[in-house]
Amino acid sequence: VMIIAAAPGGVTSNILTKFADGDVALSVSLTAIVSLLSVLIVPLIVFNSADFLGVEITKEISMLNIAMKMFFVVTVPVIFGMIVRSLMTDFIVSKTLIIQRLSVILFLLVFISIYVEEWDRIVSFITRAGLIAFILNMTMIFVGYYVAKFWTSGIAQRKCISLECGLQNGTLAVVVATQLFNDIVYMVPTAAYALVMFTTSIFFVLIVRKIN
């Protein structure tokens, strides 16, 4: 649970922020900044949590090793995207509508394929860790919304920050879990959270789209 809680948001939050009529520019900026910082922060949180909770890290692996793997999984794609955006600004801007539509289609295809292909595992994951994943996800969404309400004046920013808090980078969490532990049980909360967050976030988007 600490692994998925420590994981930064992913690009999914950018797509859903667009669906929710939120502040997309803020969402992209937050994703980029947090992804860069996560290389240092996530290993620190996970290693300290494992030590505090008395969980044995079964593999001989260092924080530096994990940080380097995270750099290639999270940071490199962000840097690459920023470089492409700066070099091809006019082209990207002219194709914004097409890119947005493709993002919608790809998101829906991934969402549906996960449920169709992994249905047997989904039942197992939800049974074992669904409740804690749901509580964590909803807590982060509401905390993000009301913290943003206190600090910002715009509803678009509140939508954005709620989704940034509620949506985690499941791929990164799986990478960290598989690198540190040999037992698949440590991946169950991550898998359950990924399934829960997609579902709750879609409902959240449908609700907040009506709020202006």
Map each language-model feature to its residues.
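Alpha-helical transmembrane segments of multi-pass small-molecule/ion transporters
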Residues: 1-212
